[in-house]
Amino acid sequence: MTGPRVFMVAAEASGDLLVREVVEELRRRSPDAHIAGIGGQELASVGIESAIDISPLSILGFFEGLKAYGDVVRLADEAADAIVADAPDVVVLVDSWGFMLRVAQRVRLRAPDIRLVKLVGPQVWATRPGRAKTLA
């Protein structure tokens, strides 16, 4: 019997730390799991090479975010392509609300049968309550 096929996605340092912990636990519980992903140094530290370079997403501030919008859209497309090509059973999207929403939308369009899980959702109560509807 083969283990689950899991694709992890983290686009910022805090998410990358969480992904590392999830990968370590998943390997402990299911040693035959196939795990691929997109992330940074923490993901690499557990032996998973990032499918795409996410360094352009390391942005701070409103104006820097506006300048990087084209990169966000391009990387969301590249991430979705990598996910669909890997054909996982489940994708775990960690943190980075805006980027992960774009990735999730693209994956749903290209491969609607792939299950998507959001780990560390946005603080709906602290930001925009309308996000709760989008998450559901």
Where are these regions (language model features)?
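Active-site and donor-binding regions of nucleotide-sugar-utilizing enzymes
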Residues: 4-136
